[in-house]
């Protein structure tokens, strides 16, 4: 972050409930520390997509931040299942889902897009990149209008992995 979060940011972030889905203990700790520094009110954790789906159904997070590669249910499959969840089940299938991955090739980005990921962030992840992605996700949700089952308006945009420090490698 170029600047410290404003009082308004901190006030808003205190209202957020964010679910981290990551099999690496170190990465979960890092993401938790980053989110705490932003003032996020409630941080939930899951080690894989299977546990995340249980937490999603029971706890109703506002945002999901997930890794792509996990077992037994990876971030792609978890995203597909979240998007398929009906509002009749009390779930929000349009929840912002941010995927963090070290795999930034076009095939991975397209796969994430096809499964309904809101934004794709490249590792290593900077605090400013995560902060900007969260603000963008809650300010004006970006989903894919060509994704079957999406119920809300959204601008079309090309999904590109966000690179820390302006790195443009793919």
Segments (PLM) and residue ranges:
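Two-component/phosphorelay signaling modules centered on CheY-like receiver
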Residues: 25-44
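Receiver (REC) domain active-site loop signature in two-component systems and cognate sites
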Residues: 70
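Active-site beta3 strand of CheY-like receiver
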Residues: 59-65
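C-terminal output helix
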Residues: 107, 125-134, 138, 142, ...
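Helix N-cap/capping motif at the beta->alpha junctions
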Residues: 45-54, 75
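CheY-like receiver
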Residues: 11, 139-170
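Short, glycine/charged-rich "phosphate-handling" switch motifs in NTP-dependent
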Residues: 118
